[in-house]
Amino acid sequence: PHLEAIGAGTQDFMGNNTIALPDKKEVMEVNPYYADSGLWSVFSFRFLTGKPFTQADVDAGLPVAVLSESLAKRIFASTDVVGKYFTFIGKEFRVCGIVQDVSNATPDTAGDLWIPLFLYSWVSRTFEGEKLIGNVHIYMLAPTPADKEALRAEVQDVFRKYNLQTSEYENDLMQQPDDFWKSTFRKNSCEAPDWGELLKGLIYILLALLFIPAMNLSGMISSRM
């Protein structure tokens, strides 16, 4: 009752991410985003043509893709390309939709193309038999701000119960789930942020920004005297 939508996604910064048209040798570097169908419900994407891939596509690992407007124009010189094909990670992908470009100012959703999550090889791997996977971000949308604490408690309770079934490893959420703004400060998945140190750092930056104009102003006053 405290969850409106949930989605998962991750970017691949390690692979050789190039695409090509089936009938051409020229390749282009791209920034792929691997996602499940829930991502379309959590975040707002503006579809220019076509539609997003479905959860059935994700579960089956079908080679379908949503392209950004810019990438569609780079590859096909048009955005009216639903149903056309291109080659990526050794597979022939069919274009199912085109979305308006997503700004890099929102890196959690930005990409040149979005493809089904289970096509990412790291997602399908397990760790020491405990079925633990990493490098996938889960995004949850609560109906109201008042539901967030209840949703956070429910997630933590699910992991507590899951840990009762594991024999060797224990999952530690490190105080997650975070509010979205807090998640931008989480740089290491293996430890919780030190909010005290982060706050001190921000205060030092603020004081420095205030001190520099003060120095400039005092210099102007001295020169006039």
Report the location of each language-model feature.
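Glycine-centered tight turns that cap/initiate beta-strands
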Residues: 2-5, 80
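Short acidic/polar micro-motifs at solvent-exposed secondary-structure junctions
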Residues: 4-38, 52-65, 103, 180-184
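Short hydrophobic/aromatic segments of transmembrane alpha-helices and their interfaces
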Residues: 23, 55, 130-132, 184-185, ...
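Membrane-helix interface segments
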Residues: 26, 146-147, 197-200
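Mid-to-C-terminal secondary-structure elements
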Residues: 36-52, 63-193
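Short, function-defining helix-loop hinge/capping sites that tune catalysis or transport
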Residues: 44, 58, 76, 221-224
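Hydrophobic alpha-helical transmembrane segments of multi-pass inner-membrane transport and secretion
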Residues: 191-225
